[in-house]
């Protein structure tokens, strides 16, 4: 069994829980997710099965879309609704224009510091392990891409009796929406936290493409595997090169290929090699030999 499943991760489960359950449902060990979703977050979680696990990093690198509820006037230890209250401040009226100005400032490339309650590693240890022990450590900042921030709940003003707003966030890999909520609050002069979150898109998979674990289980019991998307879906944005049988034989052995073969994709960081409409391998320019490309991943194929 090889392919990608757009799973709808339900609230209350970890991403690892989903992998564990799918291994049992699909009767296979080769199952991997494409980026962690916190337990209290529901949403699109592409799962790679079989040979598709070789593509997990590329699927993970694609953009994401979230719908978040952000609450002003209160900050928490975890930057979301699960944490303990740290600070509170009564809201004076914040106009829609003031909020929009803050959103505009945070669109584009921004620098974030990961929250203490996160899986980022510092000195070989996950930040949440330090946090649970009551230890605060210096965290490395990271640059992330915010493609768009769109308010979804109209243009009403925010105040003490209406401290929350809905936001659609299109962003790149590694963005912490919790931290973005805090940053919006800081620009407006208030403590803030992310009170709810749903991931509505991950790479090329949308909410409407997804199935729950229960639905997948029912389909498997009916011998229906139509929930699997082909491997090629995971590399839709990657440059592609169609190869002939002679080249294919070299690719299967992990051979180096001449740069001249990649003329139409020469400015790309990598290219997906396609043989008989199937993904065969992913190649990239050789770091030392300018006249050669080398394999980054070779996907074995069963040829009929």
From Swiss-Prot:
CDD domains: PseudoU_synth_EcTruB. InterPro entries: PsdUridine_synth_cat_dom_sf, PsdUridine_synth_N, tRNA_psdUridine_synth_TruB, TruB_C. The lineage of its organism: Bacteria, Bacillati, Bacillota, Bacilli, Bacillales. Belongs to the pseudouridine synthase TruB family. Type 1 subfamily. Responsible for synthesis of pseudouridine from uracil-55 in the psi GC loop of transfer RNAs. Its EC number is 5.4.99.25. PANTHER family: PSEUDOURIDYLATE SYNTHASE TRUB1, TRNA-PSEUDOURIDINE SYNTHASE. The keyword Cytoplasm does not apply. This is tRNA pseudouridine synthase B. The gene is truB.
């Amino acid at each position: 069994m090889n392919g990608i499943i757009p799973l709808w991760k339900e609230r209350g489960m970890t991403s690892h829980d989903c992998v564990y359950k799918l291994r049992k449902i699909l009767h296979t060990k080769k199952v991997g997710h494409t980026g962690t979703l916190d337990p209290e977050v529901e949403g699109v979680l592409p799962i790679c099965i079989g040979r598709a696990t070789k593509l997990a990093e590329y699927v993970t690198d694609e953009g994401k879309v979230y719908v978040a509820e952000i609450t002003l006037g209160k900050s928490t230890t975890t930057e979301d609704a699960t944490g303990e209250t740290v600070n509170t401040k009564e809201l004076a009226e914040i106009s829609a224009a003031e909020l929009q100005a803050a959103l505009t400032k945070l669109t584009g490339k921004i620098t974030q510091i990961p929250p203490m309650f996160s899986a980022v590693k510092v000195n070989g240890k996950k930040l949440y392990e330090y946090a649970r022990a009551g230890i605060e450590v210096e965290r490395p900042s990271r640059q992330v891409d915010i493609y768009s921030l769109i308010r979804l709940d109209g243009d009403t003003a925010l105040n003490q009796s209406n401290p929350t707003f809905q936001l659609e966030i299109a962003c790149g890999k590694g963005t912490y929406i919790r931290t973005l909520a805090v940053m919006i609050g800081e620009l407006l002069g208030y403590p803030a936290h992310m009170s709810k979150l749903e991931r509505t898109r991950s790479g090329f998979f949308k909410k409407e493409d997804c199935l729950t674990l229960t639905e997948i289980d029912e389909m498997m019991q009916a011998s229906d595997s139509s929930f699997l998307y082909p491997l090629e879906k995971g590399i839709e944005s990657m440059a592609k090169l169609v190869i002939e049988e002679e080249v294919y034989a070299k690719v299967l052995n992990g051979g180096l290929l001449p740069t001249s073969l990649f003329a139409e994709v020469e400015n790309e960081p990598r290219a997906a090699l396609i043989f008989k409409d199937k993904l065969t391998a992913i190649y990239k320019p050789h770091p030392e030999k300018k006249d050669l490309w080398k394999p980054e991943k070779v996907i074995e194929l069963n040829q009929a």
